Amino acid sequence: MAKFIVYTTWYHEKGLRPADEMQDGMRKNVKPLSPAEDVFWWKMDDNHHQSITIYSSEDAAKKHRAELEEYRKKSSNEYSIKMVEETMGPVIAQMSKL
């Protein structure tokens, strides 16, 4: 099965937290609970960050979906953030695998 990617954009009402706080949040809240192969967060501007989550398959992403939605709801309230965009789909080419 092909790897599966979930891409999101998030709005931070109070501005982005410092990188070390974002990394700590990922370390404590995302890494232990996520079956994803990898997750990248990056700064878009002072009030937005974007994210790519890489799953081993679409099935793995679907199985994680309910838990992910619950985590998103909690973190949205806790950190005053809102998801403004989400797209997803199967990987069709990966340079490191060529």
Residue ranges of predicted features:
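Short S/T/G/P-rich N-terminal loop/turn motif that feeds into the first structured element of a domain
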Residues: M1-Q50, I54-E70, N77-L98
